[in-house]
Amino acid sequence: MRAYLDLCQRIIDQGTWVENERTGKRCLTVINADLEYNVGNNEFPLITTRKSFFKSAIAEFIGYIRGYDSAADFRKLGTKTWDANANLNDAWLNNTHRKGEDDMGRVYGIQGRAWAKPDGGTIDQLKKIVDNLKDGIDDRAEIMTFYNPGEFHMGCLRPCMHTHNFSLLGDTLHLTSFQRSCDVPLGLNFNQVQVFVFLALMAQITGKKAGMAYHKIVNAHIYEDQLPLMKEVQLKREPLALPKLIINPEIKSLEDLETWVTMDDFKVEGYECHEAIKYPFAV
């Protein structure tokens, strides 16, 4: 995927050095990156200039769709992405809102499916969007956001990719997703997969055609210890043709996504890639 490599090169050429207080590492940073994925043509943005994986990213987002708040439930789906944040985060371990082992608190999917109202009760943001789209309605506010500053203290992590805005033009569904920060060598492909899959699934369960997914990143960065591999290995490789994502056509409703869907319902066809690259991870 050339756009991915172009962003990496832009960060190297134009980035500003920033000291990250959380990680204690320096990173080259640019502000504002826009990526586009043609979901209608099934051009699945799985990085080909290094070996990449997709099922963990999909599993995590299915967990968000289900409103999970336990790392154990994410593990059952096939991803361990929440284990550390739920169980190894000192600030969260000492937080009185933590309910016990594997509890994540009010993050991501909880906000999307059960946003707390000031007067009591909750709002199911996702169901409202699905119901509207099935009826051909776009009220220009088909938005699901995980970003709730009033409850940051009640969760183990602030959302990174935080808001998803659907737009319906005729019978074609588009998606614009917003991300506040991105570790480009390691994290971006994970998020690319999620943006693509979210639009593909929403189009499928609402009976619409999938159109374009627009992925907007505010702070895109490469850590200093990732630069040698990026410059000397990944950027010297030619991207290969993008694969296709095959989603089980029997997935027809939000209830299906909430109940029986597993990672066996997602397959990739035609994926060819270069060898793996083991980038350092900033904890």
Swiss-Prot record:
What InterPro entries does this protein map onto?
Thymidate_synth/dCMP_Mease, Thymidate_synth/dCMP_Mease_dom, Thymidate_synth/dCMP_Mease_sf, Thymidylate_synthase
Record pathway: Pyrimidine metabolism; dTTP biosynthesis
> Which GO BP annotation is one of this protein's?
dTMP biosynthetic process
* List of residues binding (6R)-5,10-methylene-5,6,7,8-tetrahydrofolate: D183, A282
Q: Name one Pfam family in it.
A: Thymidylat_synt
Q: Does the keyword Ligase apply?
A: no
* The reaction(s) this protein catalyses: dUMP + (6R)-5,10-methylene-5,6,7,8-tetrahydrofolate = 7,8-dihydrofolate + dTMP
Task: Write down the SUPFAM superfamilies for this protein, in alphabetical order.
Answer: Thymidylate synthase/dCMP hydroxymethylase (SSF55831)
Where does the record place the catalytic residues?
C160
- Residue positions annotated to bind dUMP are R22, R180, S181, C182, D183, N191, H221, I222, Y223
Subcellular localization, as worded in the UniProt entry = Cytoplasm
**Record field: transmembrane:** none
Subunit and partners: Homodimer.
**Function of the protein:** Catalyzes the reductive methylation of 2'-deoxyuridine-5'-monophosphate (dUMP) to 2'-deoxythymidine-5'-monophosphate (dTMP) while utilizing 5,10-methylenetetrahydrofolate (mTHF) as the methyl donor and reductant in the reaction, yielding dihydrofolate (DHF) as a by-product. This enzymatic reaction provides an intracellular de novo source of dTMP, an essential precursor for DNA biosynthesis.
Instruction: Spell out the protein name for this chain.
Output: Thymidylate synthase
Organism the protein comes from? Colwellia psychrerythraea (strain 34H / ATCC BAA-681) (Vibrio psychroerythus)
